[in-house]
Regions:
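Active-site rim segments in enzyme catalytic domains, especially the processed small/beta chain
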Residues: 70-95, 112, 255, 260-265, ...
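Extended C-terminal subregions enriched in glycine
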Residues: 450, 497-500, 531-532, 540-599
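Noncatalytic scaffold domains of N-terminal-nucleophile
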Residues: 18-45, 49, 56-239, 244-296
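Positively charged n-region of N-terminal signal peptides that target proteins for export
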Residues: 1-4
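Internal maturation/activation junctions in enzymes
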Residues: 313-452, 456-459, 598
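Short, well-structured alpha-helical segments that form the helix of a local strand-helix-strand
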Residues: 58-64, 149-160, 244-247, 252-254, ...
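Amphipathic alpha-helical
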Residues: 238-271, 364-398, 463
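Hydrophobic h-region of N-terminal signal peptides that target proteins for export
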Residues: 9-17
Length: 631
């Protein structure tokens, strides 16, 4: 009898294990020394190589960014980098703002004079100054352990030639007609003149970028020359930084940009700098959640958490109609504030950050959530009284209209779809919607046993990118996130030297004062929507990081798009195709216009630090090429 009982227990345990194994399409990643998770297998390998060289999580993250920049379909070297770093020595979380700024001459009048109602979403006039090179070098100089030569070695080897992956090859092929318009891009990407139908490289072909390789070697050369002169490791890396932004590399970027009709000046690059800054934070169920400031959309997730703290989400059950309705409206409230109040914190007017993140303000906003019906006309609130201030834009706030999209952009390309990271919901989503989850932006997560933890959301310069002369550097397309009219966002109106308000949003969470979760995602306006739900899946519903990356999400289109024509579709919701009929019926009754897809999230990547066991859990998206390596 005892033997039978033992057999039954063993069978039950085996069945339980099998159920656990089939809960996710990908297994969770485990490690005890270090972990690197990102959107490209080769980039994850670059991170692993740096760890094996003795680098820390910051070095590994920088190498992953550099490698991904060399592969083009999600970002390139002229884009922007945003990071959160936990330093185990200071026990502080620090933010890295390596976002470019609008160049000289980029004014509302300039773009309106060319017939635009918003800055363009591609081409040379869509470019802000390059930020990622400065971001990588600052991260390594201030928080890394290795030389720039070590950190850039994988990217340089790739620029010399690597076996092109299918996704990048397909992206080049899709954009071949546009790449023909820009001579330096054509030289790099359309290398087979004898095959006009498919002039780009194919999957498996060795893809070489000699101009980019030369530029990266110039950075290493500047570092090594400084070291020979007796400079410190940090000083030598900043010598490379100066060569990029103030030396011959900068001059070629400016020359190549202006030759193709761009606005960059040498002063634009020389005056730009990386900001090392204090992030913003809130608490949820005793967990400290950190985001970059309101020059990103990241604080909208914190606002949503503050609102949702007033509800029993676990009691509603996962993805029930009541839960979906509550989360949707909380996001709508937070993103309405994002659309109105968020902007560059280094340029006037000053944003009401304290009021926006006030718990009392969140309680008042939470009262607006209707448990029975969605409100498609949710408007921004007024956070100023919660920081003892007076709203400087009362008329714009009073007249804010969420019921209709802005006018179409004359002469623009807002409907081409492939550059937009998050497209408008339609009754039948096109393939462009699915491409949008793959194109533009990646996420980079790294952690090590020493205690370093890093979350990065680099982006910009994705295909079809304009390459700046013979530098090999592709230009960003981030100007499109500005507005030209204060009525569409008084804090985010374009001006020379100003950062656009971006969607890019790394996340770092502490438990008991120590790193617990690092996570981020690509997907434009959906980024913090999906990260919010990932976080709730882990905290409220006890999912592992792999389960939470694969869990079905909802996406709202009730906020203004940060891309193209800045469209808005109140009441539109994207749901997973697995939602049962009774859930669909309830949401229809609540006033939602529903669209369904098998994929409802950009690729979330995450690392959880398991302190009781001294190990790491990694999660990477089951869609696309996202990949992790741990040891």
């Amino acid at each position: 009898m005892k033997r039978l009982a033992a057999v039954l227990l063993l069978l039950a345990a085996t069945a339980s294990a099998q159920q656990t194994l089939i809960r996710t399409q990908k297994p969770p990643l485990h490690g005890s020394h270090w972990m690197a998770v990102t959107g490209k297998p080769l980039a994850a390998t670059a991170g692993a190589m740096i760890f094996q060289k003795g680098g820390n999580a910051v070095d590994a993250a920088a190498a992953m960014i550099a490698a991904t920049c060399t592969m083009w379909d999600t970002l390139s070297w002229g884009g922007e980098t945003q990071a959160l770093i936990y330093d185990p020595h200071t026990k502080k979380v620090t933010g890295i703002n390596a976002l470019g700024v609008a160049p000289t001459g980029a004014t509302p009048e300039f773009y309106k004079g060319k017939g635009f109602t918003h800055p363009p979403d591609e081409g040379v006039l869509a470019a802000v100054t390059p930020g990622t090179p400065g971001g990588i070098m600052t991260m390594v100089a201030e928080y890394g352990r290795l030389s720039l030569k070590d950190v850039l070695a994988p990217a340089i080897e790739m620029a010399d030639g690597y076996a092109l992956e299918a996704q990048s090859a397909n992206t080049m092929d899709r954009n071949k007609e546009k790449l023909k318009n820009w001579p330096y891009s054509k030289k790099v990407f359309l290398i087979h003149d004898d095959n006009p139908k498919h002039p780009g490289p194919v999957a498996g072909e060795i893809f070489r970028q000699p101009d980019l390789a030369a530029t990266l070697r110039k950075l290493v050369e500047a570092e090594q020359q400084a070291l020979k002169k007796g400079k410190s490791r940090k000083e030598a890396i900043y010598a490379a930084y100066d060569r990029f932004y103030k030396g011959d590399i900068a001059r070629e970027i400016v020359r190549g940009t202006r030759e193709q009709g761009g606005l960059f000046t040498e002063e634009d690059l020389a005056n730009w700098k990386v900001h090392i800054e204090e992030p913003v934070t809130t608490t949820y169920k005793g967990i400290d959640v950190y985001k970059l400031n309101v020059w990103t959309q990241g604080p909208a997730m914190l606002q949503a958490l503050n609102i949702l703290e007033n509800f029993d989400l676990k009691g509603m059950s996962f993805n029930s109609p009541r839960y979906i309705n509550t989360v949707y409206q909380a996001m709508s409230l937070a993103w309405a504030d994002r659309d109105f109040y968020y902007g560059d914190t280094y340029a006037p007017p000053e944003e009401p950050v304290l009021g926006l993140l006030s718990k009392d303000y969140a309680k008042e906003r939470a009262k607006l959530i209707n448990p029975d019906h969605n409100d498609p006309k949710i408007k921004p609130g007024d956070p100023y009284p919660y920081q003892r201030g007076v709203n400087p834009f009362p008329d714009l706030l009073r007249n804010w209209d969420t019921s209709k999209p802005p006018a179409s952009k004359p002469g623009g390309t807002q409907d081409s779809g492939l550059r937009n990271e998050f497209l408008r919901a339609t009754p039948s989503l096109s393939n462009d919607y699915l491409f949008a989850f793959y194109s533009g932006t990646t996420s980079v997560e790294a952690a090590d046993a020493e205690g370093w933890a890093v979350s990065v959301t680099p982006s910009g310069g994705w295909l079809p990118a304009v390459i700046a002369g013979n530098s090999g550097v592709g230009l960003s397309e981030r100007m499109q996130s500005f507005v030209l009219d204060p009525s569409e966002g008084p804090y985010n109106v374009v001006a020379p030297g100003k950062h656009p308000r971006v969607t890019l949003t790394p996340t770092l969470a502490l438990k008991d004062g120590l790193p617990w979760l690092v996570f981020s995602v690509q997907g434009g306006d959906s980024q913090d929507q999906n990260l919010l739900q990932f976080f709730l899946d882990v905290v409220e519903f006890g999912m592992t990081v792999q389960e939470a990356t694969e869990a079905p999400n909802i996406n709202s289109f009730q906020m203004h798009s940060s891309f193209g024509g800045h469209d808005i579709k109140p009441g539109n919701i994207l749901l997973n195709s697995s939602e049962p009929p009774w859930v669909r019926g309830e949401l229809r009754r609540m006033g939602y216009t529903m669209t369904f897809e098998d994929r409802t999230s950009g690729p979330i990547n995450a690392i959880m630090i398991d302190r009781p066991h001294g190990t790491f859990w990694g999660g990477s998206s089951n869609h696309g090429e996202d990949y992790g390596i741990g040891w």
